[in-house]
C-alpha cells in the first residue's frame, strides 16, 4: 500500500497530508491521472445512435458526470453487438435496455450489470403503430415491421404477434416504420414514442402496449461491463448517479441546457 501511494504521489495523481498521530490523509485526487495509472487505456463506452432527445440527454449526461476522466462514447446500432464488444474488451461498458442486458446474461456469464438508470432513462415507451385507423391491434394477415438487428423491437413484436395467424413479417429498420406505414408497405409496427413526438408525426394511429407487454425494462437504461472488472464497476457506480443522469436528461428535454456529446 505504501509503495502504491508513493507511486501515485510521484505521478501527481494523489496529494497526501500528514496529521501527526492521526495518520496521513488524502488531500486531493486527480482522477484523470489515477485513470492513467490504473487503466491501460481511456474509458470507452458505447450506446445507441442519439436520434432521440432521450438518447441525446443520456449521452450529454455521461460526458458531464465522467468529465474528470479520459472518456469517449461510440454510437452504434444493435445491443447484441455492443454487448459482445464489451465482453471482448473493445468497450469498457455499453448502455442498453435493462431487458436486453438481462436477456443476454441468461445465456452468457462474461458480462454483468454495473448500473440501472431508472424507468424512462432509455426511452419513454414503445407503442404500436397501425395503418388502419379502425383497427384495435394486430390482426390476422397483417404485414408487420420486423427489425432483426434491434433486440428490443424484435422481441416486443414477437410478444404481441404470438398466436396470431397469417402474420407476414416485413424486414426493415425500426426507424423506417413510420414511413413504411404511410407508404403502404406495412400494416403495423413497433416504434418508440420519443421519436414520434420529436419528429412531429401527425395522423398516426397509436396503440399503447402497456396492457400487452411489460414495457418497463425496455424503457430502463442499464450500464453493462465485462464481468470481474470491479474497479470499473465501482467507478461507474460512484460517478454515474441515476438522479444526476435523469436531471440532465430532463434539462435537455426542457431546453434548459444545450446538448453536448
Where are these regions (language model features)?
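N-terminal hydrophobic or amphipathic helices and topogenic motifs
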Residues: 1-81, 215-217, 228-261
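Conserved hydrophobic residue
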Residues: 14-16, 91, 186
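Periplasmic-binding protein-like
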Residues: 30-31, 114-132, 202-238, 258-259
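Mid-protein regulatory/catalytic core that forms ligand/cofactor-binding pockets
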Residues: 45-155
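Active-site regions of enzymes building and remodeling cell-envelope glycoconjugates
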Residues: 69, 110-113, 163-169, 202-209
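Short helix-initiation/N-cap motifs at beta->coil->alpha
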Residues: 73-85, 168-182
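A ligand-binding cleft/hinge motif common to bilobed small-molecule-binding domains
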Residues: 95-108, 179-209
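C-terminal regulatory
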Residues: 139-177
Amino acid at each position: 500500500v505504501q509503495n502504491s501511494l508513493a507511486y501515485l504521489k510521484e505521478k501527481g495523481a494523489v496529494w497526501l497530508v500528514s496529521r501527526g498521530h492521526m495518520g496521513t490523509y488524502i488531500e486531493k485526487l486527480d482522477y484523470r491521472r489515477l485513470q492513467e495509472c490504473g487503466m491501460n487505456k481511456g474509458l470507452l463506452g458505447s450506446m445507441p445512435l442519439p436520434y432521440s432527445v432521450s438518447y441525446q440527454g443520456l449521452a450529454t449526461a455521461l460526458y458531464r458526470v465522467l468529465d474528470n476522466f479520459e472518456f469517449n462514447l461510440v454510437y452504434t446500432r444493435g445491443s447484441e453487438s455492443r454487448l459482445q464488444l464489451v465482453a471482448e474488451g473493445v468497450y469498457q461498458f455499453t448502455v442498453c435496455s435493462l431487458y436486453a442486458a438481462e436477456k443476454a446474461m441468461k445465456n452468457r456469464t462474461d458480462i454483468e450489470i454495473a448500473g440501472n438508470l431508472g424507468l424512462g432513462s432509455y426511452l419513454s415507451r414503445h407503442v404500436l403503430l397501425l395503418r388502419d385507423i379502425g383497427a384495435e391491434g394486430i390482426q390476422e394477415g397483417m404485414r408487420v415491421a420486423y427489425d432483426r438487428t434491434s433486440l428490443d423491437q424484435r422481441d416486443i413484436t414477437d410478444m404481441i404477434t404470438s398466436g396470431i395467424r397469417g402474420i407476414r413479417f416485413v424486414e426493415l429498420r425500426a426507424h423506417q416504420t413510420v414511413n413504411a406505414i404511410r407508404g403502404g408497405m406495412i400494416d403495423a409496427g413497433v416504434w418508440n414514442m420519443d421519436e414520434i413526438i420529436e419528429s412531429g408525426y401527425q395522423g398516426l394511429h397509436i396503440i399503447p402496449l402497456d396492457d400487452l407487454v411489460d414495457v418497463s425494462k425496455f424503457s430502463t437504461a442499464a450500464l453493462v461491463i465485462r464481468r470481474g472488472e470491479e474497479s470499473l464497476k465501482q467507478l461507474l457506480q460512484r460517478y454515474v448517479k441515476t438522479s444526476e443522469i435523469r436531471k440532465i436528461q430532463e434539462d435537455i428535454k426542457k431546453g434548459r441546457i444545450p446538448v453536448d456529446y
